[in-house]
């Protein structure tokens, strides 16, 4: 079987949103290889930086952990400066031959800012404070945008509802959610 005909790893829907001074990152638990579910309870959302930063990652697992380790190192070097740490990581990502081949994306957030780190080494801040990445990211993003202005729904409720909608549409997303908030 040639490398290009090998089944690819799929999975992960990560959603980050802000509402009423709260920030939430939610991730599903499914990892698939081709049409097979390999794991249903993977943890793709974490707190780092002493619990002050939320991270959700999508893409190849080993690559995502490599980037997470690099981000943690940048945060140690630039404590309390999430944007600067992400920009420094992006610089490395663009210039390091090894990192350039990593296939992963991350959504990161602290109390002030939410950012996407793309597979091309970009750092993007969404204009509406809502991020959706991974196989079901666009579904979760659309659902969160539809729910965000509804009175009585807090950030975690919106995240859970949006992720449930994504899980109902995307075959690479399940309903086993991990939610972290600040």
From Swiss-Prot:
Biological processes annotated in GO: proteolysis involved in protein catabolic process
Q: What is its main location?
A: cytoplasm
Which N-terminal residues, if any, form the signal peptide? Answer: none
Q: Say which domain of life the source belongs to.
A: Bacteria
Q: Any idea which residues are catalytic in this one?
A: 12
Report the catalytic activity: ATP-dependent cleavage of peptide bonds with broad specificity
What Gene Ontology cellular-component terms does the record carry?
A: HslUV protease complex; proteasome core complex
Where is this gene product found?
Cytoplasm
InterPro entries in alphabetical order: ATP-dep_Prtase_HsIV_su, Ntn_hydrolases_N, Proteasome_sua/b, Proteasome_suB-type
> Which EC class, in a word?
hydrolase
Documented activity regulation: Allosterically activated by HslU binding.
Q: What is its EC number?
A: 3.4.25.2
Q: Which Gene3D superfamilies match?
A: Glutamine Phosphoribosylpyrophosphate, subunit 1, domain 1 (3.60.20.10)
Q: Which NCBIfam families match?
A: ATP_dep_HslV, PRK05456.1
Family stated for the protein in its record: Belongs to the peptidase T1B family. HslV subfamily.
The job of this chain, per UniProt, is described as: Protease subunit of a proteasome-like degradation complex believed to be a general protein degrading machinery.
Give the quaternary structure.
Answer: A double ring-shaped homohexamer of HslV is capped on each side by a ring-shaped HslU homohexamer. The assembly of the HslU/HslV complex is dependent on binding of ATP.
Record protein name field: ATP-dependent protease subunit HslV
The record lists the organism as: Paramagnetospirillum magneticum (strain ATCC 700264 / AMB-1)
- Name the encoding gene, please: hslV
């Amino acid at each position: 079987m040639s490398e290009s005909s090998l089944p690819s790893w799929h999975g992960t829907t990560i959603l980050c949103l802000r509402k009423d001074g709260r920030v939430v990152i939610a991730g599903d638990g499914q990892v698939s290889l081709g049409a097979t579910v390999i794991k249903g309870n993977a943890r793709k959302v974490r707190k780092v930086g002493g619990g002050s930063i939320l991270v959700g990652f999508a893409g190849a697992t080993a690559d995502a952990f490599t980037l997470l380790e690099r981000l943690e190192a940048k945060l140690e070097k630039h404590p309390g400066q999430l944007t600067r740490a992400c920009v420094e990581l992006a610089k490395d990502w663009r210039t390091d031959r090894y990192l350039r081949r990593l296939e992963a994306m991350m959504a990161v957030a602290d109390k002030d800012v939410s950012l996407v780190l793309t597979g091309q080494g970009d750092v993007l801040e969404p204009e509406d404070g809502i991020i959706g990445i991974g196989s079901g990211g666009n579904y979760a993003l659309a659902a969160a945008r539809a729910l965000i202005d509804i009175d009585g729904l807090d950030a975690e409720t919106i995240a859970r509802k949006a992720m449930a909608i994504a899980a109902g549409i995307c075959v690479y997303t399940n309903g086993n959610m991990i939610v972290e908030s600040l």
